[in-house]
Each structure stands twice: as C-alpha cells, then as structure tokens.
Amino acid sequence: VGPYFDRFLTRWPTVETLAAAPLDAVLHAWQGLGYYARARHLHACAQAVVARHAGRFPASEAELRALPGIGDYTAAAIAAIAFDLPAAAVDGNVERVMARLFAVTAPLPEAKPELRRLAATLVPAARAGDYAQAAMDLGATLCTPKKPRCVLCPWRENCRGRALGFAEELPHRRAAAERPLRRGVAFWAVRPDGAVLLRRRPEKGLLGGMMEVPSTDWRAAPWPVAEALA
C-alpha cells in the first residue's frame, strides 16, 4: 500500500490541490488503496476544508466531525495527534484494551459509548497525541484479540480483566445476524467494436458513483429469465 499512497500524495500534496482535482481522477489514483468510498470522502473533505476553513483543518472535535467522512474516531485522532489536544481516539484496538482494563462485559456494539467514556478518563492533558498512538499500538501489538502478551503490558497490574481471569474473552460481541441471500441478474452487452455497456451507480449508497454492468434489482426470490429481461 505504501508506494500507492506515496504516488497519491505526490500527485496531490496539499488540501488545495486535492480539492481542485476531478473526482474521477482521484478515484482512479486510489486504485490499490482500499475502499473507494474513502477516496470520495477524502475528496469531499478537502473541498469542505478549503471552502469553510481556508485550507486549514480545524482543531476542535466538533468542527472536525462536521466535515464529510469524519466520525468520532477520526475527529479525536486528528485533534490529539495533529493538534495535541486531550481527545480520546478510540479504534477497535483501544476498545479491546479498555474492555479488558476495566472488565467491561457488556457486548459490542452496545458497550461502545461506555468504552469511549472510560478511554476519555485516561487521556493526559499533555502529549495527548503520543498517548493516542501508544494506546492504539498497545492494542495492536500486546493486547491482541488472541493470546495477549499480558506479561509485557505496562497496565498489567491495573487490568481488572486479567485479575478476574477472563481478559482474553473480552470484549464480548453480540451474535451477528444471519446474512440474507439476495439474487439478481447482470447483463453483459458488447458492441461489435468491443465496447461494453456500463452505467454509473447512484452517488449515495453502496459503491456510490462507481461504474457497473446493468442488472436487475436484488431480491430473495430467483429471477426467471423472461422477467429479468422484461
């Protein structure tokens, strides 16, 4: 991923250059970097920062959350790491650390607000950015989902989950609902010159704005050929 991202940053090194770029060019350059929705949000966010904040990211979590594509975690991470403000950046790694440290047995996702609250109680007034990155690294390297390396953890003496003997079981998760099966029919239409018929998906929703082959709607019942072609 690194070389792809380096090329992306070389092409658009500033918020202003990214904001001025055509969306299609940004999406094309995002190939190999993950979900295209992230590129769309990044582009929209750059445009909002230029239009609303003269090209400079705001420092407050509230203003950051008002930008496209930025939620609680990203807003807190920017506030802490970029501006060294005391904000609790809670990703999946930090959720796991907090659940074990405080022995929170309520399942996810219901436990998320409580885990964020507990995480906020530990954020120092100084060097908040260093702490945010250290907490995430702790979850990624020591307080791992399986076989946590508790003997090396700097919080091992204060960990309630470890003291109670069930740290590795945490956090609990609510059983996932069974995924429904949906069926559809896709159409492959090719001109004599080899061009393939494509259409653009709606801007909102799954894979918004991406190109696809035409298809029917998706439903539980099978599609008879005659009905699909109607």
Feature roles, as predicted:
Residues 137-230:
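Intrinsically disordered, low-complexity, charged terminal extensions of DNA damage-control enzymes
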Residues 1-169:
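Catalytic cores of DNA base-excision repair glycosylases
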